[in-house]
Amino acid sequence: MATKTMTAQELTDLRLGTLDTAVTDWETMSKRLKTLSTGEGGGVNAQRLRAEATAADWSGVNAGVTRDFVTKTAAEFQDVAGQATSVLGILRDAGAAFKRHKADLRTVIDDVAKRNIYINAKGGAVASVPSGAAAGSGDIPTPSDEELAVAESRVKRVLREASETDRIAARALRALARNKHDFTGDGPGGIKEADDRQGKADADYWARRVKESDPSEWSAEEIERFNETLIAQRDNPGFSERFATTLGADGTLQFWRDIADPGQGKTPEGERAKILGRLQQNLSMSLATASHVDSPAMDTWKREIIASGGKQFGHEGIMVKPYGFQIMSNLMVKGKFDSGFLDDYGSAIRTFEQSKGSQFNPAAVWGNPGIAAKLDYTGEGGTPGSDPMAGYLKAVSHNPDFATDLFLKRLPDDSDDPNAPTRTMADYLLSEREFYDEDDPFGEGDGTMQSRDALGKALLAAGTGLNPDVPAVVTDYDRTPEQREVLDKSLGLLAGKKDDFPPELRDDMAALLANHGDKVHQSASSLNSGDSALDYKDLLQVSKQVSRDQDAYGLLMEGVNQAIIADMHAPHEGDPKEELLRAGQTVGFMESARYHALDTDKDDPSWPAKWAYHGAGGVVNFVPVVGDALQRGVDAGAYAWQMEEQARIDDELAIDKSQNFQSRQAYLTALGEEWSRVNPGHKLSADGDEYLRQMDISLAALNGNKSANGTVGSS
């Protein structure tokens, strides 16, 4: 059943004239057959013939046979007319859909071309910037990796939708033409109905296979066929609801428990583990689609999934029995689940954990060897997937609006103190709940806590409104009050951890700060820490903790650099010298955070290897890119900063302890030059006054550095 995805070239070259002709021909055919069937317009017709044959007084040896033949023939005329109507509906809908797909692709191609992006024949996005000679004196920006990824994602979406139209139409037409001597009058009326029927038929088939066989014995080929069905039907509610509700809540959980880890030395590995990883993700997406269906059957399924969270599910012949929460959370790793379901499910996990007592230890419950089945195959080699909070938080990160609501959700007041501060889920997740290394629940493991890594992605989604797993290009600093509140709340909670700041959250917190770079810059450059947009002490402490990881620090500085340049280009009242001084002040602040991070870890034996600079990586798509006019200054500043950072690394991270900003003189110079480019008429931009400009921005950096150092010393 493997289906080929259409290429950009194939969709572009698709000629719809023949299809339009077929629609016209079938319109004529359908009208004629309908006339013969019902007699519209008068004349001989099957409906009249059937009525007369039924009412007639037949006699003779073959009377019964003849009556049946005539009435059956008359009925078949009606079926033929109905089938013709179905064919017409499929062809008409397909034609309209393909025209829409072609127009959508053309729109995307034309749109991304404005960003100097070319879409190749296969649908890939590549930079298309003319050479220096061809460009002349024009300053043509090269598209970023994030812009290329977004462009390619847009094209793939169109191609996937076009391929789905092709698949659904072809399957429906084949079904209608299956028997040349028999006709059906109840065919689908169009593409949408055909999609629904096909989805339900596939769901019935696979639900029956699950019930009538042992999924742990399925061959790799059969699992891959199921994968292909899940991919084809991933956004089809007809399939997803039917499959989930036919299996039922317990049946769904038991299926994954059986196929994921049958035990007895049969725990999947190698190629089968990879196939199961794909199945886990595809089934997650299908269940996510189902969660949005508003029907009594689906409501029952969701309630029963939650009710079964505290049940244990075994497998024949083995003692290991994981909880329903553990199984279901591993089927929530992909797709956007319904917000109401996520809220109810997350509350149920927390209630279950609380029922284990005030001294609840997640590792002792979820990591217990007696329930330690292998349920997660999404990572390299997979992880046990024992902490249900990991899969749940992945699902939260894929629904950013819900993520924001979750982190700000108030918890019941169980304190006797009337003045006790209001607790939220942010308090619970970032400060109260314990996490553990699923690979080694009762040992040291590799030091990475998978569920806390998922927590970082959920926090990032909550504070930015973006899905961390979807390419994006952010072009402004417009954030909702709720997203700002998530940032404020998380800053306070994580700053309180000081050097116990979770390493898994460094890159995500760096991305969150970069996404709110305007507020970070305003706060870091504040003359009065009490008036800063963000809490000055909290920002400094979190910036320090983020800076303990080279890549996270690089990402943070990408965001700060963008924000500084954007501030220089933004309209302001008063002397623009303020933006020059603020730039220096922020650089001094960030260098203080960086120095204290280095000083904290200087005795770590793994310290030298830890700091090789690799760049900020894929999460740069959270950094706002505010207009092409800024890009030259952004690039110049980033280049100067990176060169100085590399030199610092080569010099074993040497830094002037008293004046940390001194290692940033080239960066300060680049910022000063960009400021003069924006303000050519200012006296500090006059020829010969470069020294004065450099002195001003350097003194501002010194002031920012001293203020930050003093704050660190007092905390």
Describe the function of each predicted region.
Residues D186-V712:
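Non-catalytic all-alpha helical scaffold/repeat segments
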